[in-house]
Amino acid sequence: MTMLTCKPACELPVTKEENRWLVQDLWAEEAVGVIGAEPKSMKSYFALELAVAVASGVPCLRRFPVARRGRVLLYAAEDPLHVVRRRLEGICAASGIGIKDLDVYVITDPTLRLDLEGVRRSLDAAITGLRPRFLILDPFVRLHRIDENASGEVAPLLAFLRELQRRHGLAVLVVHHSKKGAGHMRAGQALRGSSEFHAWGDSNAYIKRTGDDTVTLTVEHRAAPSIPPLTLELATNRVGVALRVVDRSTPSVEPPSSIDERIIAILAESQEPIPFPKLRGQCRARSATVHQRLAALTLAGRVSKSPLGYRLVGGVQELQTRHEEDLDDPDSP
């Protein structure tokens, strides 16, 4: 008989604090879990906010940092591909980036039946080839033809997703519906179908509509404390819409104007674009705060972003770049 593989507890791997999170406070590194909400409660928008953050490295919702960016593999079963693109573009605009900055791959097959062995092998092959850090499947009800209320049918499918997570070292998010009229129940217990969903998740997020335009986001983690609930709303920008945090508390950081002035002053003194890490260090502010203000300044047209970093629109660097482009253009007067 072959003995199981065992090792002393003191030889188990140690995870550094900065490696615990895929998205700080919202989703743990290599965690499986669900986003649960009733229909039309912005859960798909929140899944895409996480996707943009991981795929670009910008803070999720412009405030929750990403320690290390990575590829995202997304399957959106209920939305046409042009709608998925438009939503991604809206979130990118709010984050001060372009859609070409995203390392997101979208599964375009019309169906994805994870209760079929052949489809499972195809998904496994896609993950092997693309090597994403984050897999998002939206929604669960479109991934199978099993009875969601039967634990014996749900458990094997969730076990397959857990197997993918462990074998490939990636995080897995499944968007799932809540039961109708379950407002009095604990968030995890309100998920539709078997209790296996709640037990399966390492990181779970629950969204509850609190008004015509706002929802409340609650998160829980198996191995970390939860943050207080957040109020979110959809905000329109020049390209589309994106979620934003409605912060009714007293700000504990510097007013945006003072940080904006500092960013502009630093960029104005530089002859070259400044990479984000260097700019954040010179600002002496939190990464999430600097990202948030840079996104706002970019939307306002005062700052531009390139692969080399950030520069002031109309500043010395941009004028110099335009001059060099004119010299290279034989048709320039």
Region roles according to the model:
Residues L4, E11, E17-E18, L22-V23, ...:
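Conserved inter-motif catalytic segment of the P-loop NTP-binding fold
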Residues E29-E30:
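Pre-Walker A (P-loop) beta-loop-beta motif of ABC nucleotide-binding domains
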Residues T128-R131, R166-H168, T210-P333:
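C-terminal regions of RecA-like/P-loop NTPase motor modules
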Residues G33-G36, L73:
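Short hydrophobic/aromatic beta-strand immediately N-terminal to the Walker A/P-loop
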Residues F46, L50:
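Hydrophobic positions on the alpha1 helix immediately C-terminal to the Walker A/P-loop
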Residues V34-I35, S44-Y45, F134, G152-A242:
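Phosphate-binding/switch region of NTP-binding enzymes
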